[in-house]
């Protein structure tokens, strides 16, 4: 006899389906049997009898009377049996009407009750079946509360080591002790050393937190249990706590091992926020996690690693010594780190001989590891699309632009007058980027629409990584932001909506200068900010200003004056270089793209030389751009 519970559980499904089919067939037959019967009143029945239409009667003791007409039509009426007295029945029989009495056994009452109860019975069987299936790892999401959703990655398959991680040498050094402990915990125990129970990896998205954790597991050659913080919280209260206990139990059984919890803030947020109460499911899960991290012995060879983008909102009990002792921050990679990361992602890819990895790294400031990987893959896809056997520098440049602003939208139709405005707008940014001494160098100018909103853009990239920005650099940056609007007003004597985002960014930067960085003589070196309230109650709801209304007016007035003076400076510089601006506009309008090197060369030319350079170019056909917008 097979006593396998899974085998018995697998039989419930077919039986459940057969039961539903049988009930549906039964209900269909019952419906067919009653669909041809017409409900009438007792008076109508008497009239039909008097009209000699009825040929037979069936009288139920419960008061149900069924009558059959000569044409086969069936009628049904409920009437007290006292109305059908003996004398009346005999009279009917004498008239040739067949009268039959039926004893009611109560079967119809049970059938009626069963029909009413059928939906509830089906629902109960359905839930019972799904819960039985959930025990074997099947069933609906949320009902599968008995299953531990942690995914185990075998370090021997698809192994990742520190050789696959670049640009974070300091992080590797911090994690070397963890690797050595997992390889040989007895060596640490002999010296009386205790390894940290937990390692918290924090940093911006895409900086490689998960990759680092898997590299530690690969270096130590131990099992790696991966689970997202949101996986702990499910439909039923107590499920998350049970999963925490199951996760640690399984890791202990396969120690040494690494438990990695991604997006820890999903389950580890600060408690007692007033939302959900003390018995909130997430808080119960967090309590279970705190208990488990206190309960296991570090000598067991279990290391808990977690990643989050928001360490500031984690519960303080989770960060105290004895739980997540070691805290490691992964920052956005600098120039050298980007160069090393690009080299790793170029492994196994055919690239042209003239590819300069350092130049690619310089062209991608602010890119994190995930962006760089996406950029290299995008370049490979572009080369494959053109059926080329290697990746060229043009592929990489196009891939960088795709990552920053999206793919070119060649199908978007721009009218000639809109194209003129976009041309002058972008050159307003670019010319000021060259003229202002502290502005970042221009890398590329294009009027080809990209992404959702960009009708064109001017790419300015710093020549080196900067960690501090001076006041003159910020001021020149603001003037450059206003260059697009200034060019529109100078050339066409009107402005468009294209400068909306520029104004927004410039205003935000000026507000930060005035109110927080102390770069205003009138306001002074004081940080006028806002005190942020509880994150979980909503920042805007509980945010309080730490300055008076009078101070707010002074700040707004200073911001306005600074924006207006910067705008005047932008217009003056562009007006002084109007002839050069017009020649550059003719060139950009026809070519649609200007590289940073070519733009610099054109800005260094005198006006006559620039005029010959532009008008003698074979691609320049339209030259009458700036006479009138209309």
From Swiss-Prot:
Its EC number is 3.4.24.-. Binds 1 zinc ion per subunit. Residues 1-8, 132-630 are cytoplasmic. It is found in: Cell inner membrane. The chain crosses the membrane at residues 9-29, 111-131. The active site is at residue 426. GO terms for biological process: protein catabolic process; proteolysis. ATP binds at residues 203-210. It comes from the Bacteria. Keywords: ATP-binding, Cell inner membrane, Cell membrane, Hydrolase, Membrane, Metal-binding, Metalloprotease, Nucleotide-binding, Protease, Transmembrane, Transmembrane helix, Zinc. GO terms for cellular component: plasma membrane. This is ATP-dependent zinc metalloprotease FtsH 2.
């Amino acid at each position: 006899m097979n006593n396998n519970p899974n085998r018995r559980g697998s039989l419930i499904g077919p039986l459940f389906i057969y039961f539903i089919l049988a009930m549906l067939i039964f209900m269909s037959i019952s419906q067919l049997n009653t669909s041809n019967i017409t409900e009438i009143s007792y008076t109508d029945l008497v009239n039909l009898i008097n009209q000699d239409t009825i040929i037979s009667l069936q009288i139920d003791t419960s008061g149900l009377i069924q009558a059959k007409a000569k044409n086969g039509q069936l009628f049904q009426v409920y009437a007290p049996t006292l109305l059908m007295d003996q004398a009346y029945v005999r009279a009917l029989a004498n008239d040739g009407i067949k009268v039959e009495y039926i004893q009611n056994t109560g079967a119809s009452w049970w059938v009626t009750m069963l029909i009413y109860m059928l939906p509830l019975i089906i629902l109960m069987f359905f839930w019972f079946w799904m819960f039985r299936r959930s025990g074997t790892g099947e069933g609906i999401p949320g009902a599968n509360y008995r299953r531990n959703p942690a995914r185990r990655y075998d370090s021997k398959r698809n192994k990742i080591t520190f050789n696959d991680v670049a640009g974070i040498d300091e992080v590797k050094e911090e994690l070397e002790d963890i690797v050595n402990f997992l390889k040989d915990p007895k060596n640490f125990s002999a010296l009386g050393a205790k390894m940290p129970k937990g390692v918290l990896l924090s940093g911006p998205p895409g900086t490689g937190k998960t990759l680092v954790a898997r590299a530690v597991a690969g270096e130590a050659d131990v099992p790696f249990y991966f689970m997202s913080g949101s996986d702990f919280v499910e439909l039923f209260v107590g499920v998350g706590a049970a999963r925490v206990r199951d996760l640690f139990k399984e890791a202990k059984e396969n120690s040494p091992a690494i438990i990695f919890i991604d997006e820890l803030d999903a389950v580890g947020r600060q408690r007692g926020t007033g939302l959900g109460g003390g018995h909130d499911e997430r808080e119960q899960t967090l309590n279970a996690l705190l208990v488990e991290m206190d309960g296991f012995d570090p000598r067991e060879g279990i290391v808990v690693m977690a990643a989050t983008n928001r360490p500031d909102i984690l519960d303080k009990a989770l960060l105290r010594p004895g739980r997540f002792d070691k805290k490691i921050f992964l920052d956005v990679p600098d120039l050298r780190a980007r160069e090393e990361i690009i080299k790793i992602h170029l492994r196994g890819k055919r690239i042209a001989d003239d590819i300069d990895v350092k130049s690619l790294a310089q062209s991608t400031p602010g890119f994190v590891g995930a962006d760089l990987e996406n950029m290299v893959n995008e370049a490979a896809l572009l080369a494959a699309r053109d059926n080329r056997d290697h990746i060229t520098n043009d592929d990489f440049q196009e891939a960088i632009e795709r990552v920053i602003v999206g793919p070119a939208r060649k199908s978007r139709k721009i009218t000639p007058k809109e194209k003129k405005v976009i041309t002058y707008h972008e050159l307003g940014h670019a010319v000021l980027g060259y003229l202002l001494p502290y502005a970042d160098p221009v890398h590329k100018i294009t009027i080809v629409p990209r992404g959702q909103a960009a009708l064109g853009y001017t790419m300015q990239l710093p020549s080196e990584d900067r960690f501090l920005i001076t006041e003159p650099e910020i001021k020149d940056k603001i003037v450059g932001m206003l260059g697009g609007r200034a060019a529109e007003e100078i050339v066409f004597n009107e402005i468009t909506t294209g400068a909306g985002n520029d104004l927004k960014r410039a205003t935000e930067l000026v507000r930060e200068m005035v109110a927080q960085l102390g770069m205003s003589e009138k306001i002074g070196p004081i940080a006028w900010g806002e005190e942020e309230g509880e994150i979980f109650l909503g920042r805007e709801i509980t945010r309080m200003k730490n300055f008076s209304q009078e101070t707010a007016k002074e700040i707004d007035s200073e911001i306005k004056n600074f924006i207006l003076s910067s705008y005047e400076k932008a217009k003056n510089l562009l007006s002084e270089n109007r002839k050069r601006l017009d020649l550059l506009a003719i060139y950009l309008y026809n070519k649609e793209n200007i590289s940073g090197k070519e733009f610099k060369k054109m800005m260094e030319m005198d006006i006559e030389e620039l005029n010959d350079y532009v008008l003698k170019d074979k691609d320049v056909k339209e030259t009458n751009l700036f006479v009138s917008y209309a």
